[in-house]
Amino acid sequence: MAKRRQKKRTHAQITPEQERDIPKSMVIRVGQTSLANHSLNQLVKDFRQIMQPHTAVKLKERKSNKLKDFVVMCGPLGVTHLFMFTQSEKTGNVSLKIARTPQGPTVTFQVLDYSLGRDIKKFLKRPKSLNNDDVLNPPLLVLNGFSTSKRSDEDDQDVNVEKVIVSMFQNIFPPLNPARTSLNSIKRIFMINKDRETGEISMRHYFIDIREVEISRNLKRLYKAKNNLSKTVPNLHRKEDISSLILDHDLGAYTSESEIEDDAIVRVVDNQDVKAKHSQTSLSQKTPVKMTDNEEREKGIEEEDVEMEEPKPSENSQPTPRKKAIKLTELGPRLTLKLVKIEDGICSGKVLHHEFVQKSSEEIKALEKRHAAKMRLKEQRRKEQEENIAKKKAVKDAKKQRKLERRKARAEEQGEGQGKDGAMSDDGSSSSEDEHYSDVPEDLDSDLFSEVE
């Protein structure tokens, strides 16, 4: 398949500064048990479809890969978030960990249940499949049920936990600018809803479909039967009134998926209508109308007698809004999450909040001391490692310097030897020349070299 061409001449290119500010993500599986689970593998692939386009879609994990390998590569690749799916070997529970790189924090959720994208499509009458054009822009994030303000029945710790979760979800996608963002570019919705009673968080992924609002299906059948005699009239023998046919009272909840709800109908001003009306007004202003002398004379008389009312510019400039319906088609996957804990760092820091385990003040102090000792030991090992690396580098540099010195001395010795051999060869050649010309008499007849007359 040929590669899709990207416009570069007329489209504004993203600067390196803007590219650096865009959050990127990795969706990975960690652990031997999760790598062997086929349904979890498909869930990871579906979740990568949600995080497109700023994610590694074709990332392949190996059994030898550890979490540290992915964390190390987050810096050079500019990855800001890690979504880690793990499965417990003992209980088989699936967990989702969302970590902010490089300093954390890490939010751990327990996946209570999930449904794959293919399972969602089986229950839909008209399922939707994503194209390459549908994932060119990130989805619209909708958070429902989260509150960052303190209520009467909540304490400060719950409010802080809510703020951490909301900020974590808000930063996984780049922020939208309403003045610059085109509405046609938003084609997906990622909805995160929290149940205030149970505390469960549900995730849904939808596709946005905008349609022109038309008349109902039954009225359309009546109009077709009127205009076309071959079309049959709807059967009305079971209807008590014509309103039951038009308003669909008998159908109830068994309406078609193509039918549009009244709550989803909005009035939208189309930009194409604005451009068309603007072009028509500009053409009418630019095209001159030729008039004869009699018409000009009559026009002047009419202008003197009657004052014509000119239409207001506001009435002509505003286009008539159209009714459009917004329909959401679920793409999948579905996830139901339950918060477990929040910890500092990337899966290796101090536990800031735990949903099921409550510690006393003495236990918290002991954990803080243990964590501080662990951090000191880690810093000490890091310094020792840096010193060892510096020593190895110094030994390597000294060895390299000695090798260069030996090479230089060897080159100088070879140069001196070649000089002695050259001097000896020069002396030998001069002596051989003397011996060769010793038999030639000195008073050689000069007439042999005289000019020819």
Swiss-Prot record:
All copies of domain Brix, residue ranges: 26-348
Gene Ontology terms, MF aspect: rRNA binding
Biased amino acid composition, Acidic residues: 440-453
The entry's keywords: Nucleus, Ribosome biogenesis
GO biological process: maturation of LSU-rRNA from tricistronic rRNA transcript (SSU-rRNA, 5.8S rRNA, LSU-rRNA); ribosomal large subunit assembly
Subunit and partners: Part of a complex that includes BRX1, RPF1, RPF2 and SSF1 or SSF2.
Protein name: Ribosome biogenesis protein SSF2
High-level lineage: Eukaryota, Fungi, Dikarya, Ascomycota, Saccharomycotina
Ranges of Basic and acidic residues composition bias in the record: 373-398
Localisation: Nucleus, Nucleolus
